[in-house]
Amino acid sequence: MQTPVNIPVPVLRLPRGPDGFSRGFAPDGRRAPLRPEVPEIQECPIAQESLESQEQRARAALRERYLRSLLAMVGHQVSFTLHEGVRVAAHFGATDLDVANFYVSQLQTPIGVQAEALLRCSDIISYTFKP
């Protein structure tokens, strides 16, 4: 029996970092990720706090709308759009506590009908339903 030939693996070498010892890129270099320009409010901590509280209220409102939409979907026919433009339809049953998976029944896929299934939320691009 012959021993397998080792296939060489390409190695990516990063340039030296700004301090000369590490590898990587300078944070202010031309390859640094672009960050959106956000005006900083430094003069008044109360204004900064109110901006953070406004963002928090907006997030809370969006989360509440999302959770209410999940509650309204229970027992209804829902159409899901997945990656690669795949469209499936199913009766929505439930979701887990982390809202990471949807439990559905009568899942109609391009290759047939599945009696029960779990859809990962990370695979779902959008969903629609009629209440």
Curated annotation (Swiss-Prot):
The gene is GEMIN7. Residues 65-131 form the Sm domain. The SMN complex catalyzes the assembly of small nuclear ribonucleoproteins (snRNPs), the building blocks of the spliceosome, and thereby plays an important role in the splicing of cellular pre-mRNAs. Most spliceosomal snRNPs contain a common set of Sm proteins SNRPB, SNRPD1, SNRPD2, SNRPD3, SNRPE, SNRPF and SNRPG that assemble in a heptameric protein ring on the Sm site of the small nuclear RNA to form the core snRNP (Sm core). It comes from the Eukaryota. The modification N-acetylmethionine is found at residue 1. Belongs to the gemin-7 family. This is Gem-associated protein 7. GO terms for biological process: mRNA splicing, via spliceosome; spliceosomal snRNP assembly. The modification Phosphothreonine is found at residue 3. Residues 1-29 form the SUZ-C domain. CDD domains: Gemin7. GO terms for cellular component: cytoplasm; cytosol; Gemini of Cajal bodies; nuclear body; nucleoplasm; Sm-like protein family complex; SMN complex; SMN-Sm protein complex. Keywords: Acetylation, Cytoplasm, mRNA processing, mRNA splicing, Nucleus, Phosphoprotein. One of its GO terms (molecular function) is RNA binding. It is found in: Nucleus, Nucleoplasm; Nucleus, Gem; Cytoplasm. Its main location: nucleus. Part of the core SMN complex that contains SMN1, GEMIN2/SIP1, DDX20/GEMIN3, GEMIN4, GEMIN5, GEMIN6, GEMIN7, GEMIN8 and STRAP/UNRIP. Part of the SMN-Sm complex that contains SMN1, GEMIN2/SIP1, DDX20/GEMIN3, GEMIN4, GEMIN5, GEMIN6, GEMIN7, GEMIN8, STRAP/UNRIP and the Sm proteins SNRPB, SNRPD1, SNRPD2, SNRPD3, SNRPE, SNRPF and SNRPG. Interacts with GEMIN6; the interaction is direct. Interacts with STRAP/UNRIP; the interaction is direct. Interacts with GEMIN8; the interaction is direct. Interacts with SNRPB, SNRPD2, SNRPD3 and SNRPE; the interaction is direct.
